[in-house]
């Protein structure tokens, strides 16, 4: 396979994600309509050159060297396609804030995989890209919906293969995501979790996840209320989020059906009917303000098409 000509450009648009949704720890996630955009250009030079150009002052978490997630993902494509690495420039327009529990690292991984693959006319299948994305991230709950879109449940089968189920999300259920002006790294959020949990907590979570998925499919408010809670990770993580429990209580009191930490946090996801959305959003922002934390709480629709790419031009 030939290396693409210098000047070839590919645009990749990758949605943010909210993972876990309460009981779906490390297996459930949904794509949201907040996006990072990446433009990849084949430039002069060898595979040790990777230029990263940011178009956001909030993008300093993405580094431009070989340790960068975009570059690491591109390298995986080259390795699996048996291609000699070549120089790439990635121009990134960031809208997904880093370290907020909205899958910013997943957007970098997915963009690197899709961009490097597309610029070579896609030698790797989408299934292979999914496998590589999960391998790089270490868990599937963000990268799978980021690549495929929608609400995705991903689990290892008895044969140790990853199985992905696209789950239904009823149109009447809306998402409000309260995004604070504070950061929390995934590694920090994982450190506080115990290595073992009581079997009763695991059983409770399995039941809650079943209720939640059926509630989201049918738009059944009662099932969502009864299913959107967690025993495996949230009891240990709330203490890391300043004012988080107060924000959750405010959302529920304002009419939210359920409330959960988005991914590793600190953002908080609330599900509600459309008529309650404005009150829920305002209540969450106000509760964080009372704790001395600035925030915003936009409506974010579930994005169903996943990551998209297009060729911009040649030289």
From Swiss-Prot:
Pathway participation = Amino-acid biosynthesis; L-threonine biosynthesis; L-threonine from L-aspartate: step 4/5
Q: Say yes or no: keyword Disulfide bond present.
A: no
What is a single cellular component term in the Gene Ontology annotation?
cytoplasm
Subcellular location field: Cytoplasm
From which domain of life does this come?
A: Bacteria
- List the EC numbers from the record: 2.7.1.39
* Annotated catalysed reactions: L-homoserine + ATP = O-phospho-L-homoserine + ADP + H(+)
- Which residues are recorded as binding ATP? 97-107
Top enzyme class, one word, equals transferase
Q: Which GO terms describe its molecular function?
A: ATP binding; homoserine kinase activity
* Keywords (A to Z) from UniProt: Amino-acid biosynthesis, ATP-binding, Cytoplasm, Kinase, Nucleotide-binding, Threonine biosynthesis, Transferase
Mention any Pfam family matching this sequence: GHMP_kinases_N
Q: Name one GO biological process term.
A: threonine biosynthetic process
**Main role?**
Catalyzes the ATP-dependent phosphorylation of L-homoserine to L-homoserine phosphate.
Q: Name the family the entry cites.
A: Belongs to the GHMP kinase family. Homoserine kinase subfamily.
What NCBIfam families does its record include?
PRK01212.1-4, thrB
From the Swiss-Prot or TrEMBL record, give the protein name. Answer: Homoserine kinase
Q: Which gene encodes it?
A: thrB
């Amino acid at each position: 396979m030939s290396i693409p000509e210098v000047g070839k450009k590919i645009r990749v648009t990758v949605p943010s994600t909210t993972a876990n949704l309460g009981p779906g720890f490390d297996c459930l996630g949904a794509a949201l309509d907040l996006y990072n955009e990446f433009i990849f250009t084949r430039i002069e030079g060898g595979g040790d050159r990777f230029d990263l150009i940011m178009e956001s002052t909030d993008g300093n978490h993405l580094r431009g060297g070989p340790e960068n997630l975009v570059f690491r993902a591109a390298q995986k494509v080259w390795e699996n396609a048996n291609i000699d690495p070549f120089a790439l420039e990635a121009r990134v327009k960031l809208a997904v804030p880093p370290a907020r529990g909205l899958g910013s690292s997943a957007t970098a991984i997915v963009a690197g995989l899709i961009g490097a693959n597309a610029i070579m006319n896609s030698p790797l299948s989408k299934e292979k890209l999914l496998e590589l994305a999960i391998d790089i991230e270490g868990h599937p709950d963000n990268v799978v919906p980021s690549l495929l879109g929608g609400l995705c449940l991903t689990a290892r089968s008895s044969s140790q293969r990853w199985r992905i189920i696209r789950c239904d999300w009823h149109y009447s259920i809306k998402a409000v995501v309260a995004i604070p002006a504070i950061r929390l790294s995934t590694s920090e959020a994982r450190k506080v979790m115990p290595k073992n949990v009581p079997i009763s907590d695991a059983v409770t979570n399995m039941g809650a996840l079943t209720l939640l998925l059926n509630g989201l499919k049918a738009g059944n408010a009662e099932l969502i209320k009864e299913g959107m809670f967690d025993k495996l990770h949230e009891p240990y993580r709330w203490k890391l989020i300043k004012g988080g429990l107060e924000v959750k209580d405010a959302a529920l009191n304002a009419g939210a059906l359920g409330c959960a930490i988005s991914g590793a946090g600190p953002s908080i996801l609330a599900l509600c009917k459309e008529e309650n959305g404005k009150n829920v959003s305002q209540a969450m922002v106000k509760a964080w303000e009372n704790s001395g934390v600035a925030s915003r709480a936009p409506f974010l629709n579930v994005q169903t098409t996943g990551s998209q790419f297009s060729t911009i031009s040649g030289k």
